[in-house]
């Protein structure tokens, strides 16, 4: 008979010491696993953190271009607005500069001293050879315009003649107040003396136009009226009742014979202004007088244009009435 083999004990009974060792080893194993897992967990968390950080960083990278473009657009808008404002301000400055230049051009002296002498000499020659240039302003303008240093217009020419006559009358009135006759008045500047002498030959007491005006009144009234004693000396702005045509009456009132048709004699009031003592009140009055003179220049220009238009129409009517007769 074969001997009986002992059955292999699958689960042998472990002693208490072994159990304790196994338990301790199990605990150490579990603690090792836990330590390993705990050691691994920071690595996992650290590996996850970049992912978490990368998401907002990725979102930032995607949103950064949007914020930069928006910032660029806002910057461009502000830049455009600033450019528009600067353009508007520059435009306003240009308009102001243009207005200032226009205002300055109104008071710029166009006629030189040589032009004044040429104009007076031409006026004197025309009046001596023919008739009053004021009654034939178109012919006189055509004869003198090429001799002036600039492209003078007809209203400018008429206005300048009126101003020269007004200047002459003012100098004569000042001289009479000082006890000086127009024939003995002397000026330091040669150009002023020349213009005064030419003006005296035209509008003086023995001037061409003054003597012609007296003869014209006698002829128009049939020569039956005696010349008044007051007519022996030149008078300003005298209104004459005669048989002149309507066009000639209008011209004699509004044109060169009556440059101050508004009734304001600048020379008279400027002479009175000289008698006032220097001070704020006098300076204020002088400024007002300059403003009045500037306005008179504008009105004189308008008056000349009005006279030219009305005279043209009335002369045609007068010619038509004479032809019918």
UniProtKB/Swiss-Prot annotation:
Residues 1-98 are annotated as: Disordered. The keyword ATP-binding does not apply. Residues 23-32, 49-69 have a biased composition (Low complexity). InterPro entries: GEBP, GeBP-like_DBD. One of its GO terms (biological process) is regulation of DNA-templated transcription. Transmembrane segments: none annotated. One of its GO terms (molecular function) is transcription cis-regulatory region binding. Pfam families: GeBP-like_DBD (PF04504). Residues 73-83 have a biased composition (Basic and acidic residues). The keyword Transmembrane helix does not apply. Keywords: Transcription, Transcription regulation. Belongs to the GeBP family. This is Probable transcription factor At4g01260. It comes from Arabidopsis thaliana (Mouse-ear cress).
């Amino acid at each position: 008979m074969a001997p009986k083999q002992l059955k292999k004990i699958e689960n042998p009974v472990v002693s208490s010491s072994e159990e304790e060792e196994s338990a301790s080893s199990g605990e150490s194993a579990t603690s090792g696993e836990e330590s390993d897992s705990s050691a691994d967990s920071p690595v996992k968390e650290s590996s996850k953190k970049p992912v978490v950080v990368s998401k907002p960083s990725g979102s930032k990278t995607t949103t950064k271009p949007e914020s930069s473009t928006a910032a660029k657009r806002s910057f461009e808008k502000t830049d455009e607005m600033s450019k528009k404002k600067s353009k508007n301000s520059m435009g306003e400055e240009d308009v102001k500069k243009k207005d200032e230049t226009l205002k300055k051009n109104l008071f710029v002296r166009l006629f030189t001293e040589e032009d004044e002498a040429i104009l007076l000499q031409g006026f004197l020659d025309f009046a001596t050879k023919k008739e009053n240039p004021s009654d034939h302003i178109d012919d006189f303008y055509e004869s003198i315009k090429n001799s002036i240093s600039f492209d003078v217009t007809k209203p400018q020419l008429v206005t300048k003649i009126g101003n020269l006559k007004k200047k002459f009358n003012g100098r004569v009135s000042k001289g009479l107040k000082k006890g000086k006759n127009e024939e003995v008045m002397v000026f330091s500047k040669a150009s002023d003396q020349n213009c005064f002498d030419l003006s005296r030959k035209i509008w003086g007491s023995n001037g061409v136009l003054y003597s012609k005006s007296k003869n014209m009144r006698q002829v128009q009234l049939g020569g039956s009226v005696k010349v008044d004693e007051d007519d022996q000396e030149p008078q300003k702005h005298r209104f004459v009742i005669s048989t002149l045509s309507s066009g000639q009456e209008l011209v004699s009132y509004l044109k060169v014979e009556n440059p101050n048709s508004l009734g304001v004699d600048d020379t008279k009031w400027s002479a009175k202004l000289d008698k006032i003592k220097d001070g704020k009140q006098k300076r204020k009055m002088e400024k007002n007088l300059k403003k009045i003179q500037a306005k008179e220049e504008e009105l004189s220009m308008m008056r000349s244009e009005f006279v030219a238009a009305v005279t043209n129409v009335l002369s045609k009517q007068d010619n038509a009435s004479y032809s019918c007769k």
